Amino acid sequence: MASKKLKVALLFGGRSAEHDVSILSARSIREAAPKGRFEIIPICIARDGRFLPPDRSEAVLSGGAKAAEGDLGFSFEHWVRDQKIDIAFPIIHGTFGEDGTLQGYLEIIGLPYVGAGVTGSAVGMDKWMMKYAFAAAKLPIVDFVPVSEAEWRSDQERLQRTIDNALRLPYFVKPANAGSSVGVTKVKSEEGVPAAIEKALRFDDKVLVERGIDAREVEVSVLGNDSPEASVPGEIVAGREFYDYEDKYIEDKSSLVIPAKLSADKSEELRRLAVAAFRAVGASGFSRVDFFIERGTNRTYLNEINTIPGFTKISMYPKLWEATELKYPALIERLIDLGMERSKKRKERFDSTMRWFEEVKSLT
């Protein structure tokens, strides 16, 4: 007797600047997911936060329509229960998708999901918290200065001095909560700092000013829950001065070298650090960990972790696993299985906690 297909709600779109990137990732997943095991049902979250029903979501995913303001949303929670959806696969990058907010909603309605939980997502999205987590785990990071909007508005001169005393030029100025290099500026002079911070503050009220280094950019994919594994490393050779949003998604002048041309020892170091970074933020399911390898010194620095990395067939995350002998359809299958596994364990712990409370109540 054939086993029942798992019903998977493929969540895509979202409210962030990476809405269109999410559509590309979702399209690739839907096309490649093993049809014998999964029924993939697309659910688009419009730019204003409305959940669109499957028929309208299908039109958006196929490229024949956009989520218009006049489209009516629907009750996702009621639909999940009515259709007996088994698991959600959120592939929404950036704010309100990768930062723990969507994950918290899925926890509340009791729907299993692929990827990191609330805490891992939130820490992985916020570059301040991420850096603090890496530092607490004694992982190598580039020197940085955190700048809040409130501090910047109240005393720009003091903060400028703090930055100039703590870091060497050039600097990279980044919003703390934005993906795909949105709002990032490379600053080559002290006079350029105010404009770069103002630009970053358009995207978030927290900014990271980081020491710029002349480095190779290398990435490692991580997969798993309690026993995560790391892929072979891959290198990005940027077509611009640094690997920014335009280079990633518009001009596409960068190239990927997979596997990266590294010594066996350096490759193993990166894989070990990638797993350590994954654990440091409390991630699960999948993440991509980005590194700098400084030219001249060959020192390795952790740049950041992405808990919902780009997931098209040509994105770095799946390409690294393909080079590690895990094909794209099998990778999707593994991620859904990991989501189900994680949800089962969380439910068992929750049920155990509730039984304990009931036992305590019965004694009073």
Give the ranges of each region predicted by the language model.
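Phosphate-binding site of ATP-dependent enzymes
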Residues: T185-R272, R295-Y301
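ATP-dependent carboxylate activation and anion-phosphoryl transfer catalytic cores
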Residues: A2-L6, K138, S263-T364
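ATP-binding N-terminal substructure of ATP-dependent carboxylate-amine bond-forming enzymes
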Residues: M1-T119, V123-M125, M129, S148-R158, ...
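A glycine- and small-aliphatic-rich helix-loop capping segment at beta-alpha/alpha-beta transitions
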Residues: G104-Y113, S189, P194, A323-T324
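Solvent-exposed alpha-helix faces
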Residues: R27-S28, E198, V275
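Hydrophobic beta-strand scaffold residues
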Residues: I40, P112-Y113, I141, Y171, ...
